[in-house]
């Protein structure tokens, strides 16, 4: 009887720990999916040769990339990773 109580306590503790980690993951995913204050719109423009540009708009075709937490938006494609304030983020380009 004592063994069953100990096993039940261990099982309950394991389930509680797993539920806690699932809740943290869900909270983290919810904050990543919401565009807004975490969205640090770090824009970088690229010409077709891949070099960063500072020219006036309309000079050549450009790619605009932003460093985002979470996933890229619909029209953007994942182009690597970037770092904002020590957090690894997605580099999303159009």
Swiss-Prot record:
UniProt KW keywords: Antibiotic, Antimicrobial, Defensin, Disulfide bond, Fungicide, Secreted, Signal
Location(s) in or outside the cell: Secreted
SUPFAM superfamilies reported for this sequence: Defensin-like
GO biological process: antibacterial humoral response; antimicrobial humoral immune response mediated by antimicrobial peptide; cellular response to lipopolysaccharide; defense response to fungus; defense response to Gram-negative bacterium; defense response to Gram-positive bacterium; disruption of plasma membrane integrity in another organism; innate immune response in mucosa
Domain of life: Eukaryota
Disulfide bonds: 65-93, 67-82, 72-92
Annotated propeptide span(s): 20-61
InterPro entries: Alpha-defensin, Alpha-defensin_C, Alpha-defensin_N
Gene Ontology CC annotations of this record: extracellular space
Span of the signal peptide: 1-19
Chain's role: Defensins 6 and 7 have bacteriostatic activity against Gram-positive bacteria S.aureus and L.monocytogenes and Gram-negative bacterium E.coli and antifungal activity against C.neoformans. Defensin 7 has microbicidial activity against Gram-positive bacteria S.aureus and L.monocytogenes.
UniProt similarity note: Belongs to the alpha-defensin family.
Protein name: Neutrophil defensin 6
Organism of derivation: Macaca mulatta
